[in-house]
Amino acid sequence: MTDEMKAKREKLFSSPKNGYDLVDQAALDAMETYCESYKQYLDNGKTERECAAYTVELAQAQGYVPYQRGMSLKPGDKVYRVNRGKSVMLAKIGRQDLSHGAQIVASHIDSPRLDFKPHPLYEDSDFAYGKTHYYGGIRKYQWVAVPLELRGVVVLRDGTVVKVVLGQGSEPKFVITDLLPHLGAEQGKKPLNEAIPGENLNILMGSRPLGQEGDSDRVKLRVMDLLHEKYGICEDDFTSAELEVVPAFNATDLGLDRSLIGAYGHDDRVCGYAALKGLFDIDVPEKTAVCMLADKEEVGSMGVTGMQSAFFDTFMEDLCQSQGVSLRVCYESSFCLSSDVTAAYDPNFAEVYEKRNESRVNYGLGICKYTGARGKSGSSDADAETVAYVRRVLDNAGVVWQIGEMGKIDAGGGGTVAQYMANRNITTIDAGVPVLSMHSPFETVGKLDCYMNYLGCMAVYNA
C-alpha cells in the first residue's frame, strides 16, 4: 500500500482504537484512583436508599447544602435536594443565569433485585422462607444458589424508620436453593425463563426450631424472634417495609491485569457515580450544572421518585424562580446527557450482536443515538445536531468514546430516562459504560470506560 493510499484510508475511514492505546500513564494512574472510589460507592450503596444516603454524605463533605425554597443563589453555590430518601438532585450554580439553560447529567441509582412481599415469612417442611417479588428485568435463574443479603427499611406503625442490614461482611447470608442436576431432567427441558418460576424465588432464612415439639411454625417463630430481638419488629410490620434482597458480595477487580470491575449494581451506579464525581470535580461552570440520580428506572421511571415525577421539574423551577427565569425557557436551552449503561459486545454470545454497531469494553464512553426495541419503540432518538455537539464536547476534552446500539434489531432492546428528559423539551442523548452480564447479580465493566464516563460527565458540565 502506498503512503498516499494509507493516508487516504486514515483520513476517510473510521478506525476505532482500544482506549489503552490512546492514554498515557498519568491517565492510567488517575483511572485507578477513580475506580477505587467508585468501588467504595458501590459497596456503600446496594439499594437506592443507601445510594441516596451515601450521595448526601459525599455531597456534604464537598460543601453542598440542602436547597431551601427561596434561597438566594450565586455562581459557585452548591445545593442538593433529596426526594423521599430514594433519589437526589444536585446543582452547582453557573456564571450564566438559567435563561441560558443548564447542563444536566441524569442517571439512576436503582438496580434489578428481589423485593420482600407484604407477607413474606412462612414455614414449609421445617424451613423458614422469605417470599420475594422480583424488581426489574432479571433473569431468574441467575439468582439461585448465590449468597444474598437483606437490606432496606421497616417503618413501624408510629412512623419510626428501622434500618435493616442482614448478611453484611461476616454475618450469615441467605440463599435461594436450586434443584440438583440428578433430579433436574424435567427442569432442564424448560426454557431458561421458565426453569425458575418467579414464585420460587424464596430465600432460605433458617431451619432451627424454637419451642416444644408439636408446636406449629417453630422455625418461622425463631426467625421472627431473632428479627424482633435485633430490630424490634413483628410480622405485621412487614406490610410497611421495603426490604430488598441483593447479592452478598462487594465490588472487586477482575482479570490478572485488574482491568475490569465485577460487582452488583453497575447498572446504573457506574454512571450515577460518574455524574456525581464529575459535578464535584468541576470549577464554577458557565451554565448551571445539574446531576440527577433517579429511582425506578428499571420499572419504567414511574412514581414519585422516578424520572417521570414532577420532582425534577419542581427542583428546576425553584432554581429558576430564584433567578427570575421561566422554567420552560430554561428547558429549551438546556442539554441532558442521559447517562445509562449500554450492552457491551460479548463474543460468547456474538449471535445477538451486530458487531459493526456495538460498544466494546475498553473503547471508551458508549454513545447511543437511540435505544428502544425493534423499530426504536420507546426510544429517544437524538438528532444529528445533538450527536455532533456531543462529539465536539468529548473530543475537545480528550474523552475516548464510541457509538453503538444495543444488539441486533430484532433481538430485544432497552430504554433509559432519555425519553422523559426529551419530553420536557430538553435536548437529550444517551451515553454510558458498556456492561457485560447486564442485570445479573454480578456485572462486569472496564475500568477505562468507567474513567472515560467520568471525564465525559465533566466535559458536559463544562460545555
Language model segments and positions:
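N-terminal hydrophobic/helix-forming segments and targeting peptides
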Residues: 1-463
